[in-house]
Amino acid sequence: MRNWRWLLLVLAVLLAWLQYRFWFGPGNSGEVMMLEAQVAHQTQDNEGLRQRNQALAAEVKDLKDGEAAIEERARSELGMIKPGETFYRVVEDAPLPAPASAEASAPAQQAPEPVDPVDHP
C-alpha cells in the first residue's frame, strides 16, 4: 500500500514538472502560438510577393516578346508618336465655381449696350 502512495507521489511530481515545462519552459505554448502567428503573417507576405513577381515576370515577357507593349510605353511615358501621326492634346475646361446663393444663380437681366451709330476713323 505504501508503494502505491510513493508511485502516486512520483507521478504527481512528474506531471507537475511536465506542466511547468509546457507552460513556462523553453518552447512553451506561448512561444509556439507566437511563432505560428509569425508563420501565418510571413505566408501572407510571401503570397503578396509571389503575385508581384508573377506580374513583373509577365510584364518582362510582354516587353521582350510584344512590340505593342513597347509602343504603348513609349507613347504614354515618353510622349512618342509614329511618323505621319499628329499629336492632339485634349485639355478640359476647369469647372466654374458654384454660385454662393440662389439669387446669383438666377439669370441677371441687363440692358443691351447702346450702339454708337457714328463711324470712327
From Swiss-Prot:
Annotated GO CC locations: cell division site; cell septum; plasma membrane
Compartment list: Cell inner membrane
Region (Disordered), start-end ranges: 98-121
Pfam family, one: DivIC
Periplasmic topological domain residue ranges: 25-121
InterPro entries membership: Cell_div_FtsB, FtsL/DivIC
Chief subcellular location: membrane
Keywords annotated in UniProt: Cell cycle, Cell division, Cell inner membrane, Cell membrane, Coiled coil, Membrane, Transmembrane, Transmembrane helix
Biased composition (Low complexity): 99-113
Coiled coil regions in record: 31-66
Protein topology in the membrane: Single-pass type II membrane protein
Cytoplasmic topology ranges: 1-6
Gene Ontology biological-process annotations: FtsZ-dependent cytokinesis
Source species, domain of life: Bacteria
Database matches in HAMAP family: FtsB (MF_00599)
Quaternary structure and interacting proteins, as annotated: Part of a complex composed of FtsB, FtsL and FtsQ.
Free-text function comment from the UniProt entry: Essential cell division protein. May link together the upstream cell division proteins, which are predominantly cytoplasmic, with the downstream cell division proteins, which are predominantly periplasmic.
PANTHER family linked: CELL DIVISION PROTEIN FTSB
Family: Belongs to the FtsB family.
Protein name, UniProt field: Cell division protein FtsB
Gene: ftsB
